[in-house]
Protein backbone atom coordinates (compact mmCIF):
# COMPACT_ATOMS: atom_id res chain seq x y z
CA UNK A 1 0.00 0.00 0.00
CA UNK A 2 2.89 2.35 0.79
CA UNK A 3 4.36 1.77 -2.68
CA UNK A 4 0.91 2.38 -4.22
CA UNK A 5 0.69 5.86 -2.69
CA UNK A 6 4.36 6.55 -3.42
CA UNK A 7 3.78 5.90 -7.13
CA UNK A 8 0.63 8.02 -7.04
CA UNK A 9 2.30 11.05 -5.45
CA UNK A 10 5.46 10.77 -7.56
CA UNK A 11 3.53 10.64 -10.83
CA UNK A 12 1.49 13.71 -9.86
CA UNK A 13 4.27 15.99 -8.66
CA UNK A 14 7.74 14.58 -9.42
CA UNK A 15 7.19 12.77 -12.74
CA UNK A 16 4.46 15.08 -14.02
CA UNK A 17 3.67 14.31 -17.67
CA UNK A 18 3.60 17.99 -18.63
CA UNK A 19 6.25 19.63 -16.48
CA UNK A 20 8.77 16.77 -16.28
CA UNK A 21 8.39 15.13 -19.70
CA UNK A 22 6.50 17.73 -21.79
CA UNK A 23 4.06 15.09 -23.04
CA UNK A 24 0.61 16.06 -24.31
CA UNK A 25 1.61 19.66 -24.99
CA UNK A 26 -0.54 20.12 -28.13
CA UNK A 27 -3.92 19.72 -26.45
CA UNK A 28 -2.51 21.22 -23.24
CA UNK A 29 -1.86 24.55 -24.97
CA UNK A 30 -4.88 24.47 -27.28
CA UNK A 31 -7.63 23.57 -24.77
CA UNK A 32 -6.38 25.57 -21.78
CA UNK A 33 -8.27 28.79 -22.50
CA UNK A 34 -11.33 27.88 -20.43
CA UNK A 35 -11.34 26.12 -17.04
CA UNK A 36 -14.53 24.13 -17.68
CA UNK A 37 -13.28 22.78 -21.01
CA UNK A 38 -9.82 22.08 -19.57
CA UNK A 39 -11.39 20.20 -16.65
CA UNK A 40 -13.47 18.08 -19.03
CA UNK A 41 -10.46 17.17 -21.15
CA UNK A 42 -8.37 16.49 -18.04
CA UNK A 43 -10.98 14.10 -16.67
CA UNK A 44 -11.22 12.37 -20.07
CA UNK A 45 -7.43 11.94 -20.26
CA UNK A 46 -7.34 10.63 -16.67
CA UNK A 47 -10.10 8.12 -17.42
CA UNK A 48 -8.35 6.89 -20.56
CA UNK A 49 -5.08 6.48 -18.63
CA UNK A 50 -6.71 4.58 -15.75
CA UNK A 51 -8.37 2.15 -18.17
CA UNK A 52 -5.61 1.70 -20.75
CA UNK A 53 -2.57 1.26 -18.49
CA UNK A 54 -3.87 -1.79 -16.56
CA UNK A 55 -5.00 -3.37 -19.85
CA UNK A 56 -1.61 -2.69 -21.43
CA UNK A 57 0.12 -3.98 -18.28
CA UNK A 58 -1.76 -7.29 -18.57
CA UNK A 59 -0.97 -7.44 -22.29
CA UNK A 60 2.72 -6.87 -21.63
CA UNK A 61 3.14 -9.26 -18.70
CA UNK A 62 0.63 -12.03 -19.49
CA UNK A 63 0.60 -12.17 -23.29
CA UNK A 64 3.60 -10.46 -24.88
CA UNK A 65 6.31 -11.45 -22.37
CA UNK A 66 8.45 -14.53 -22.99
CA UNK A 67 7.05 -16.12 -19.82
CA UNK A 68 3.45 -15.23 -20.74
CA UNK A 69 0.61 -17.58 -21.61
CA UNK A 70 1.86 -18.02 -25.18
CA UNK A 71 5.43 -18.80 -24.13
CA UNK A 72 6.83 -16.62 -26.92
CA UNK A 73 8.50 -13.22 -26.67
CA UNK A 74 6.09 -10.97 -28.58
CA UNK A 75 7.21 -7.72 -27.01
CA UNK A 76 7.95 -6.33 -30.48
CA UNK A 77 4.16 -6.11 -30.94
CA UNK A 78 3.66 -3.99 -27.82
CA UNK A 79 3.75 -0.65 -29.61
CA UNK A 80 0.97 -1.40 -32.08
CA UNK A 81 -1.16 -3.23 -29.49
CA UNK A 82 -0.85 -0.37 -27.01
CA UNK A 83 -2.04 2.03 -29.73
CA UNK A 84 -5.01 -0.25 -30.54
CA UNK A 85 -6.08 -0.39 -26.88
CA UNK A 86 -5.76 3.39 -26.48
CA UNK A 87 -7.76 4.04 -29.68
CA UNK A 88 -10.55 1.71 -28.56
CA UNK A 89 -10.84 3.32 -25.11
CA UNK A 90 -10.78 6.84 -26.58
CA UNK A 91 -13.60 5.89 -28.95
CA UNK A 92 -15.61 4.71 -25.94
CA UNK A 93 -14.93 7.96 -24.06
CA UNK A 94 -15.94 10.01 -27.12
CA UNK A 95 -19.27 8.18 -27.33
CA UNK A 96 -19.94 8.67 -23.61
CA UNK A 97 -19.13 12.40 -23.68
CA UNK A 98 -21.24 12.96 -26.80
CA UNK A 99 -24.16 11.13 -25.19
CA UNK A 100 -24.13 12.74 -21.74
CA UNK A 101 -22.51 16.16 -22.32
CA UNK A 102 -23.06 17.49 -25.86
CA UNK A 103 -21.85 20.97 -24.85
CA UNK A 104 -18.51 19.60 -23.60
CA UNK A 105 -18.26 17.43 -26.70
CA UNK A 106 -18.75 20.50 -28.89
CA UNK A 107 -16.25 22.63 -26.94
CA UNK A 108 -13.55 19.95 -27.05
CA UNK A 109 -14.06 19.54 -30.80
CA UNK A 110 -11.27 17.70 -32.59
CA UNK A 111 -9.17 17.44 -29.43
CA UNK A 112 -11.36 14.70 -27.93
CA UNK A 113 -10.67 12.08 -30.64
CA UNK A 114 -7.06 13.32 -30.70
CA UNK A 115 -6.64 11.91 -27.17
CA UNK A 116 -5.94 8.68 -29.07
CA UNK A 117 -2.68 10.20 -30.30
CA UNK A 118 -1.97 12.23 -27.16
CA UNK A 119 1.67 11.42 -26.44
CA UNK A 120 0.98 11.57 -22.67
CA UNK A 121 -1.24 8.46 -23.01
CA UNK A 122 1.24 6.49 -25.11
CA UNK A 123 4.15 7.81 -23.08
CA UNK A 124 2.60 6.52 -19.86
CA UNK A 125 2.22 3.04 -21.37
CA UNK A 126 5.84 3.03 -22.57
CA UNK A 127 7.09 4.30 -19.19
CA UNK A 128 5.04 1.55 -17.54
CA UNK A 129 6.64 -1.03 -19.84
CA UNK A 130 10.07 0.28 -18.85
CA UNK A 131 9.30 0.35 -15.12
CA UNK A 132 8.26 -3.31 -15.11
CA UNK A 133 11.93 -4.21 -15.68
CA UNK A 134 13.25 -2.15 -12.74
CA UNK A 135 14.35 -3.58 -9.41
CA UNK A 136 11.48 -4.02 -6.89
CA UNK A 137 13.42 -1.76 -4.52
CA UNK A 138 13.19 1.13 -7.02
CA UNK A 139 10.56 3.75 -6.15
CA UNK A 140 9.42 3.77 -9.81
CA UNK A 141 8.96 -0.01 -10.03
CA UNK A 142 5.61 -1.29 -11.34
CA UNK A 143 5.15 -4.85 -10.17
CA UNK A 144 1.43 -5.59 -10.42
CA UNK A 145 -1.81 -4.29 -11.84
CA UNK A 146 -2.46 -2.11 -8.77
CA UNK A 147 0.85 -0.34 -9.32
CA UNK A 148 -0.16 0.31 -12.94
CA UNK A 149 -3.50 1.77 -11.77
CA UNK A 150 -1.70 3.97 -9.24
CA UNK A 151 0.72 5.23 -11.88
CA UNK A 152 -2.10 5.83 -14.37
CA UNK A 153 -4.24 7.70 -11.85
CA UNK A 154 -1.33 9.86 -10.70
CA UNK A 155 -0.27 10.65 -14.28
CA UNK A 156 -3.83 11.62 -15.14
CA UNK A 157 -4.31 13.79 -12.06
CA UNK A 158 -0.96 15.47 -12.70
CA UNK A 159 -1.96 16.26 -16.29
CA UNK A 160 -5.37 17.49 -15.11
CA UNK A 161 -3.84 19.79 -12.48
CA UNK A 162 -1.46 21.21 -15.08
CA UNK A 163 -4.12 22.02 -17.68
CA UNK A 164 -6.69 23.36 -15.19
CA UNK A 165 -4.03 25.50 -13.51
CA UNK A 166 -2.95 26.99 -16.84
CA UNK A 167 -6.57 27.56 -17.89
CA UNK A 168 -7.30 29.43 -14.66
CA UNK A 169 -4.27 31.67 -15.19
CA UNK A 170 -5.14 32.30 -18.85
CA UNK A 171 -8.68 33.29 -17.90
CA UNK A 172 -7.26 35.88 -15.51
CA UNK A 173 -4.74 37.09 -18.09
CA UNK A 174 -7.56 37.79 -20.53
CA UNK A 175 -8.44 40.78 -18.33
CA UNK A 176 -4.84 41.80 -17.64
CA UNK A 177 -2.44 44.02 -19.54
CA UNK A 178 -0.08 41.95 -21.68
CA UNK A 179 2.47 43.67 -23.96
CA UNK A 180 1.52 43.24 -27.62
CA UNK A 181 4.60 41.13 -28.57
CA UNK A 182 3.77 38.61 -25.82
CA UNK A 183 0.05 38.19 -26.45
CA UNK A 184 -1.17 34.71 -27.30
CA UNK A 185 1.32 31.85 -27.14
CA UNK A 186 4.17 34.12 -26.02
CA UNK A 187 2.79 34.83 -22.55
CA UNK A 188 1.41 31.27 -22.41
CA UNK A 189 4.87 29.74 -22.86
CA UNK A 190 6.27 32.04 -20.17
CA UNK A 191 3.45 30.98 -17.83
CA UNK A 192 4.04 27.29 -18.52
CA UNK A 193 7.76 27.77 -17.87
CA UNK A 194 7.09 29.39 -14.51
CA UNK A 195 4.66 26.60 -13.58
CA UNK A 196 7.27 23.99 -14.55
CA UNK A 197 9.85 25.75 -12.37
CA UNK A 198 7.39 25.63 -9.47
CA UNK A 199 6.97 21.87 -9.92
CA UNK A 200 10.76 21.44 -9.98
CA UNK A 201 10.75 21.98 -6.22
CA UNK A 202 9.23 18.49 -5.89
CA UNK A 203 12.06 16.83 -7.83
CA UNK A 204 14.19 16.38 -4.73
CA UNK A 205 11.49 14.54 -2.80
CA UNK A 206 12.49 11.01 -1.83
CA UNK A 207 9.10 9.32 -1.83
What are these regions (language model features)?
Residues 23-37, 90-104, 166-177:
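C-terminal ends of transmembrane helices
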Residues 171-189:
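Interfacial loop-to-transmembrane junctions
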Residues 22-30, 94-100, 111-112, 119-138:
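Generic transmembrane alpha-helix signature in multi-pass membrane proteins
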Residues 6-20, 72-86, 149-162:
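Structural signature of hydrophobic alpha-helical transmembrane segments
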Residues 23-27, 45-51, 83-92, 117-124, ...:
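Hydrophobic core segments of alpha-helical transmembrane domains in multi-pass membrane transport
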Residues 61-108:
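Ordered, amphipathic secondary-structure segments that act as subunit-interaction surfaces
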Residues 37-47, 77-82, 104-115, 181-187:
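Cytoplasmic-side transmembrane-helix entry/capping segments in multi-pass membrane proteins
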Residues 6-47:
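Juxtamembrane transmembrane-helix termini in multi-pass membrane transport proteins
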Amino acid sequence: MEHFFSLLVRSIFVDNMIFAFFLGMCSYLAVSKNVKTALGLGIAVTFVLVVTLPVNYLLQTKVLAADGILGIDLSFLSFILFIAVIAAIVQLVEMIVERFSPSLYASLGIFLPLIAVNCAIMGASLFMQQRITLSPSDAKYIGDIWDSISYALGSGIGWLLAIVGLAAIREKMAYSYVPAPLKGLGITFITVGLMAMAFMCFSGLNI
